[in-house]
Amino acid sequence: MNNIRKTHPLMKIVNSSFIDLPAPSNISSWWNFGSLLGICLVAQILTGLFLAMHYTSDTMTAFSSVTHICRDVNYGWLIRYLHANGASMFFICLFLHVGRGLYYGSYMYLETWNIGVLLLFAVMATAFMGYVLPWGQMSFWGATVITNLLSAIPYIGTNLVEWIWGGFSVDKATLTRFFAFHFILPFIVAALAGVHLLFLHETGSNNPSGLNSDTDKIPFHPYYTIKDILGALIMITALSSLVLFSPDLLGDPDNYIPANPLNTPPHIKPEWYFLFAYAILRSIPNKLGGVLALVLSIAILAIIPLLHTAKQRSMMFRPLSQCLFWILVADLFTLTWIGGQPVEHPFVVIGQLASVIYFMLILLIMPTTSMIENQLLKW
């Protein structure tokens, strides 16, 4: 009798993706983040669904409905904080996943990489719109400031902003449409993640050495299923600790003040996972220039494969590139810190320096260093 796992039309797709999938024998824990992101996405969709059952997307009642969820709904506080901190966990996993791709040269799988960049943009858009929904001070002013950036687009800018707002300011129409988009986007993200996996399975996984691993493959199950479960348990433990011990650690206290268009908060800033891009935006005095730098800070990932000048795929055997990679990581931490600081001396100068270093490293220094390493191989 044939194994149903290998013959059933649906089961054989699952089988070839998660059970009998040939995987390199040497992939490290840095390869766990794909599955962790999948878990995050499912958790966000489920908690979001339950929140949407009690939330009202009206400027008069949005803030109250979130309060109602936390106070009156059974385990509403838990669902709300799992959703809010789940987003932080999602971005931690995303950044580590992208960092892994950069370090080990996974960007050489062009289709997989480009869909990944698209996914990053989609998740960032989803998170931004989700942050607006509780309708606190930071929700309102964050939405106002970020959507206003589009007015820097020549000729159509002002019309575009008013079209997105659905009026002449961020108001009821804006909140309602942001709720609609925030609800639908995660399902688009899930579909894109499916395509991301589809392209990955066309080529198979990369591995730490960056070498072809066709000669040494092992089945995904049980080896990597058990490894992924361990990673998931660690992540769930971290998320649970955050939610149950300090749920507001990563949030902004200003968001516990209902939105007031007549009162601007002293420091308008987005959630921590956008601070690096926000710092790059603020480091350029020109509005349009800042917006372009903001978009390019993420979009630059799409041209990383074109900047690969090394003869080796992975950085595993390239110590100079490794040093530069960790300088880039330190630079991103610096930008994140600066993004949360007020616009005053010395933070402005530090932000400008960190922004220049960020683009210089990616566009010039790292490709040049790779070429130097190619020459060193001959010695």
From Swiss-Prot:
Where do the annotations place a ubiquinone binding?
Answer: 201
State the UniProt keywords alphabetically. Answer: Electron transport, Heme, Iron, Membrane, Metal-binding, Mitochondrion, Mitochondrion inner membrane, Respiratory chain, Transmembrane, Transmembrane helix, Transport, Ubiquinone
Q: Which cofactor does it need?
A: heme b
Q: How is the cofactor bound?
A: Binds 2 heme b groups non-covalently.
Q: What residues does heme b b562 bind to?
A: 83, 182
Which GO CC terms are listed, alphabetically? Answer: mitochondrial inner membrane; respiratory chain complex III
Keyword Coiled coil set for record: no
List the InterPro entries hit by this protein, alphabetically. Answer: Cyt_b/b6_C (IPR005798), Cyt_b/b6_C_sf (IPR036150), Cyt_b/b6_N (IPR005797), Cytb/b6-like_sf (IPR027387), Cytochrome_b (IPR030689), Cytochrome_b_C_euk/bac (IPR048260), Cytochrome_b_N_euk/bac (IPR048259), Di-haem_cyt_TM (IPR016174)
Any Pfam family hit: Cytochrome_B
The molecular function GO annotations come to: metal ion binding; ubiquinol-cytochrome-c reductase activity
A biological-process GO annotation? mitochondrial electron transport, ubiquinol to cytochrome c
Segments traversing the membrane: 33-53, 77-98, 113-133, 178-198, 226-246, 288-308, 320-340, 347-367
Principal subcellular localisation of the protein: mitochondrion
How this chain sits in the membrane, per its record, is: Multi-pass membrane protein
Q: Which domain of life is it from?
A: Eukaryota
Which family is this sequence assigned to?
Belongs to the cytochrome b family.
What quaternary structure, including any partners, is listed in this protein's UniProt entry?
The cytochrome bc1 complex contains 11 subunits: 3 respiratory subunits (MT-CYB, CYC1 and UQCRFS1), 2 core proteins (UQCRC1 and UQCRC2) and 6 low-molecular weight proteins (UQCRH/QCR6, UQCRB/QCR7, UQCRQ/QCR8, UQCR10/QCR9, UQCR11/QCR10 and a cleavage product of UQCRFS1). This cytochrome bc1 complex then forms a dimer.
Any additional notes? Answer: Heme 1 (or BL or b562) is low-potential and absorbs at about 562 nm, and heme 2 (or BH or b566) is high-potential and absorbs at about 566 nm.
Which purpose does this protein serve, as stated in its record? Component of the ubiquinol-cytochrome c reductase complex (complex III or cytochrome b-c1 complex) that is part of the mitochondrial respiratory chain. The b-c1 complex mediates electron transfer from ubiquinol to cytochrome c. Contributes to the generation of a proton gradient across the mitochondrial membrane that is then used for ATP synthesis.
Protein name according to UniProt: Cytochrome b
Task: Give the species.
Answer: Crocidura rapax kurodai (Kuroda's shrew)
